[in-house]
Amino acid sequence: MKMTRRAFVKANAAASAAAVAGVTLPATATNLIASSDQTKITWDKAPCRFCGTGCSVLVGTQNGKVVATQGDPEAPVNKGLNCIKGYFLSKIMYGKDRLEQPLLRMKDGEFHKDGDFAPVSWDKAFDVMAEKWKAALKKNGPTGVGMFGSGQWTVMEGYAAVKLMKAGFRSNNIDPNARHCMASAVGAFMRTFGIDEPMGCYDDFEHADAFVLWGSNMAEMHPVLWTRITDRRLSHPHVKVNVLSTYYHRSFELADTGYIFEPQSDLAIANFIANYIIQNDAVNWEFVNKHTNFKQATTDIGYGLRDNDPLQKAAANPNSGKMTDISFEDYKASVAEYTVEKASEMSGVSQDDLIKLAKQYADPNIKVMSLWTMGMNQHTRGVWMNSLVYNIHLLTGKISTPGNSPFSLTGQPSACGTAREVGTFSHRLPADMVVANPKHRKIAEDIWKLPEGTIPPKPGKHAVAQDRALKDGTINAYWVMCNNNMQAGPNINTERLPGYRNPDNFIVCSDPYPTATAQASDLILPTAMWIEKEGAYGNAERRTQAWYQQVKTVGEAKSDLWQIMEFSKRFTVEEVWGEELLAKAPEYRGKTMYDVLYKNGNVDAFPLSEAQELNDDAQAQGFYVQKGLFEEYAAFGRDHGHDLAPYDTYHKVRGLRWPVVDGKETLWRFKEGSDPYAKKGSGWDFYGKPDGKALIINAPYEAPPEVPSDEYDMWLCTGRVLEHWHTGTMTRRVPELYKAVPDALCYIHPADAKARGLRRGDEVLIENKRGEVRVRVETRGRNRPPQGLVFVPFFDARILINKLILDATDPLSKQTDYKKCPVKITKVS
């Protein structure tokens, strides 16, 4: 066989590299290297499938399969970098137990609640599913059905789901798993600014003089963003990094000062900083007088528990979000009690360190970026805590300018773009609209071409309330999509599993893998993943990114979008709408929900010829469904402060940060000259509020619902580790990631271990009144809790640690507190 000089050089280079690595190439390997037709890899862009950072990756496909991924060097978010999970994206779709066909619990050839899973056709799956939905609707009306979605849905999938539930079934019982991670951030944005999502952007990392992490281990949870902080800190000696947490973790390694505080005492620390700013005459009066109002939050609001729970019954103002007007003097008097002495006593942080932190906020010459994730949001006073940090930035005027940014980070790839912007929460509609507002409902009904009164005005059941309703039998048909709540959610044994196994209920789980949730369900629908479909995500800095389908899915798996739309064909309008509503739109008689919701002249406006050839969803519908859904959804936000670019634009760029007006993205919102919605001459314009002013909201320290006792003497905190993402559905199927961290461990202080006769690697029983788990202890390594607290990650399906978590929530946001519950720890003999 002849070999060209070029091929000879390439082959020798490969052989040399192999020799260095200790590998012997067979003689025929030179042929493989030289034959470009057989080794050609096709590359295209896509946002990463994991966290809310929104890194762009280049995806390499060959012979219909993803074979490689790499960081996208043209991406402004990650600039070519990936984290360890991102580098193994090519393997997440190819786990050995990938689901390829629908599975239904069967006995004697028919569905049976206690039957074994058996393969069925999609038609059979939807026949049984539709029968159960119709029975639930007949029994309890629209509130008898529910849906639990995801911040991992694409924008189009979430939007289609909102239409299916709120307009089709006329049920607001739809909520995303982002309720567990971002609801408190949303609540505080809406209360403080009247509009959701961060005012700053990632460019702030290159401008800030000080970084303050409030309950965020960015080194492991947002590692690419952490590289930008690291670069800023190491390149500019004046820059300071501050890390606040209830335990020591990897982010402390870069910190100039680390602050380990008692659980829940962050409320006291934030109020102390506000008091320090006032007492040291560091208030930016020009900003405060022109751009803020003061409010008092209602206190003693309970813990979002069942109404008959003693803790809930004891609250003076359960679940109240009411606020009253106060003056600056009232606010000053209220925070005055949070002296450095009191804050130090409550938190366990030294007075010197507290003052050091407060000075960085108070100094007008120091630009401060505050960052937080679950440590602040998963908190029974999470909305308050978010607001208290906004108070600090508003008092000093350190907001909406480069480097001055209170920044709520997100954990899922489209918790912002889908859960929040699309409005898949039980109380929301797209673009910050809410179902309780008749004007907002009218806007949605007009865009969707529906008769007035279609959308019900009462918010539906949120995530935790859905569990309770399933257990109580008031929701009987339930669809879980793109999440693993049986592992991730709180209080599994008491409140969730009983509802799934309630014989009156029918539970459907759409997932690519047999998760804990899937195995507890009655019907499992196999789902297409990531670039097996076309979609769009929205990241933490308001950046919307789109991607094309790049490979076909496996077996009979279908996208969530296809499943939603196909299921809608099983219902006529007469079966889901009352006669009174039908009388307003007689032209819809005899039509299916699919006809009314998805073939309405908007969604089906763009022909199939505009789509890429490889687009299974578009081919199935006969029109460019992703573009149609996106453009109809975008109509909600245009001229409303949430402007999106035309859909086709997103395929040409590495994302754009909304609002996008006249083709230009917005970096800093609310700032004149940067935000097109900020009025000329305003300086700052918080236009989410009618008067353009943000709120400084006074809220005190209030204790958590449970504290350690003689019997349950340790705090338990649950969370994540670098190598795994959430419940490990994808990462535990990547061999390299699984081998790196195969098991969840109980990280414990050596003194606490010694007091219990424990050595590193011993198996322990962690228990409280909600359940127990067995896990091995770790006294060294990346996570080092203080005495009295243990940390256990929740990625390990064999150790369902979240079964111990109380289903207490922030009463305002309905978000669960995973960061503090009492347990006892004993050695397994």
Curated annotation (Swiss-Prot):
Enzyme Commission (EC) number: 1.9.6.1
Binding site for Mo-bis(molybdopterin guanine dinucleotide): 85, 152, 177, 181, 214-221, 245-249, 264-266, 374, 378, 484, 510-511, 533, 560, 718-727, 802, 819
Manner of cofactor binding, per the entry note: Binds 1 [4Fe-4S] cluster.
InterPro entries per UniProt: Asp_de-COase-like_dom_sf (IPR009010), CT_Nitrate-R-NapA-like (IPR041957), MoPterin_dinucl-bd_dom (IPR006657), Mopterin_OxRdtase (IPR006656), Mopterin_OxRdtase_4Fe-4S_dom (IPR006963), MopterinOxRdtase_cofactor_BS (IPR027467), Periplasm_NO3_reductase_lsu (IPR010051), Prok_molybdopt-oxidoreductase (IPR050123)
GO molecular function terms listed in the Swiss-Prot or TrEMBL record: 4 iron, 4 sulfur cluster binding; electron transfer activity; iron ion binding; molybdenum ion binding; molybdopterin cofactor binding; nitrate reductase (cytochrome) activity
Locations listed in the record: Periplasm
Domain 4Fe-4S Mo/W bis-MGD-type: 41-97
Enzyme category, top tier: oxidoreductase
PTM description: Predicted to be exported by the Tat system. The position of the signal peptide cleavage has not been experimentally proven.
Taxonomy, superkingdom: Bacteria
Signal peptide (UniProt feature, chain positions): 1-29
Chemical reaction(s) catalysed: 2 Fe(II)-[cytochrome] + nitrate + 2 H(+) = 2 Fe(III)-[cytochrome] + nitrite + H2O
Record's keyword annotation contains Iron-sulfur: yes
PROSITE patterns in the cross-refs: 4FE4S_MOW_BIS_MGD (PS51669), MOLYBDOPTERIN_PROK_1 (PS00551), TAT (PS51318)
Role, per record: Catalytic subunit of the periplasmic nitrate reductase complex NapAB. Receives electrons from NapB and catalyzes the reduction of nitrate to nitrite.
Family in the record: Belongs to the prokaryotic molybdopterin-containing oxidoreductase family. NasA/NapA/NarB subfamily.
Protein name: Periplasmic nitrate reductase
Lineage start: Bacteria, Pseudomonadati, Pseudomonadota, Gammaproteobacteria, Vibrionales
